[in-house]
């Protein structure tokens, strides 16, 4: 909500208290922006014109580091840290009772978060990061939305992690991540993706590429 903190007025600020790992989806002619703040909770913003006005709705639930999926006539969200959950939502983006379940738990170490949810071919994919320092990217897959899921580490290279998978109009796959350089900040990092035996592979042999020729 508008406040002195968000407007950086009267000596106030909201650094590290704003949107966390926002999910953006386009479905049936509408853009959906789903996010949570640590203080106010969950919000959904929608529009038919991404450069125009957005309609804001305060949600009953907050979804930490969420990923949104429209799957046929159903709406799902993956969310959480360390223990990831998937919930089915109704048309008002409220949880449907009984359809909010634990699906995966961290395996390599704590810090599992920043998840995105996809249906690609016959698999559901949860694309997640192990945040902190050092950080790396991982993926889970299952043929059932609620699992069981199997996991594969994708890239473990100098803190390149956390982002989304994108398919272009020509069928190419890429991932937009960020390159965490500590005090220097976080730099956008685009990596090529290829699919091998139903798993995405990032960069070259699990290492990020700094330049890439098509």
Enumerate the predicted regions with their spans.
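Carbohydrate-active catalytic/glycan-binding domains of CAZyme proteins
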Residues: 1-214
